[in-house]
């Protein structure tokens, strides 16, 4: 088992894995996972010559679990990642995110462009696409509305041996582990608070201005069997990327790409990270008069 360490940053304890040496790669999981999601990617990236940092995001795994909804705004969680990288002496990591971790990675990319090398988003596309979702995507995201009722959602999800939760999750991901993790004190409310604080990732900015362009080289990966996120979200993300953009569709995989297609994901990561230059580095410096 890979050893975890803990550091207190941005007002919360963050547990994390830190393995290997080389250019840093930060892996960000989503709901209802932990750094354990990346168990197939960590050794492959370390063997590929990278330093791999995989935190348990706030509210999950062995990290702190504030119970207030406002503790889970996307800007707060981006600040967690910035503070963690500073604490660990990392200035400009590669960022790889899945599910909510991908949403955080996108936001980090356009808020902190000079603190990012390469970006990889798995399953979840740029929030600008979700600002105007299709009817089909709205229908697929019905569960996000169900999670909005503090106390009621928790009670219904736990009832009858977590029956409803298991029906929502299906047999995908680490389904048995999820129930054990969410049964820990405060864990279910903390996880659902991600949805309550960020009903629409695009609404977090609350601005009429367009999204800042993503300058980093970006890779989007989507699984054809994903029932929660439709292809439109990832396929349409390129228009928000000013740096090099690449989209990959994996046919025999669902939402949990790191588990469903570990070899393909690892191959894509190793073939992409560190291979391109950010858009802001391609500009010629202004000549001084």
In which residue ranges do the predicted regions lie?
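Flexible "cap/lid" subdomain of the alpha/beta-hydrolase fold that forms the substrate-access gate
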Residues: 1-2, 12-17, 24, 60-96, ...
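An N-terminal hydrophobic leader/cap segment in hydrolases
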Residues: 1-5, 289
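Conserved HGGG/HGGXW glycine-rich cap/lid loop of the alpha/beta-hydrolase fold
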Residues: 15-64
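A short, glycine- and basic residue-enriched loop/turn
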Residues: 34-35, 103, 253
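Catalytic histidine-centered segment of alpha/beta-hydrolase-like enzymes
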Residues: 253-262, 266
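Alpha/beta-hydrolase-fold serine-hydrolase catalytic core, especially in secreted/extracellular enzymes
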Residues: 275-289
């Amino acid at each position: 088992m890979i050893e975890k360490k803990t550091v207190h940053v941005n007002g919360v304890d963050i547990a994390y894995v830190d393995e290997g040496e080389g250019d840093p790669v930060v892996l960000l999981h989503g709901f209802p996972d932990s750094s354990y999601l990346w168990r197939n990617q960590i050794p492959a990236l370390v063997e590929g010559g990278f330093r791999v940092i995989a935190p348990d995001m706030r509210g999950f795994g062995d990290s702190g679990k504030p119970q207030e909804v406002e503790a889970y705004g996307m800007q707060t969680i981006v600040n967690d990642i910035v503070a963690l990288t500073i604490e660990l002496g990392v200035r400009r990591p590669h960022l790889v995110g899945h599910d909510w971790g991908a949403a955080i990675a996108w936001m980090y990319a356009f808020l902190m462009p000079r603190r990012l090398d390469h970006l990889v988003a798995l399953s979840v596309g740029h929030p600008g696409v979700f600002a105007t979702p299709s009817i089909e995507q709205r229908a697929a995201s019905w569960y996000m509305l169900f999670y909005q009722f503090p106390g009621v959602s928790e009670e219904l999800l736990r009832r009858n041996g977590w029956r409803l939760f298991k029906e929502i999750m299906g047999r995908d991901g680490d389904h048995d582990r999820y129930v054990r993790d969410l049964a820990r004190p405060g864990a279910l409310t903390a996880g659902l608070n991600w949805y309550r604080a960020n009903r629409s990732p695009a609404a977090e900015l609350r601005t009429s201005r367009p999204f800042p362009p993503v300058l980093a080289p970006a890779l989007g990966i989507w699984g054809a069997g994903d029932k929660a996120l439709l292809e439109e979200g990832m396929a349409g993300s390129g228009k928000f990327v000013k740096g090099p953009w690449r989209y990959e569709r994996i046919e025999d995989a669902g939402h949990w790409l790191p588990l469903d297609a570990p070899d393909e994901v690892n191959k894509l990561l190793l073939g992409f990270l560190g291979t391109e230059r950010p858009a802001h580095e391609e500009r010629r410096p202004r000549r001084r008069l």
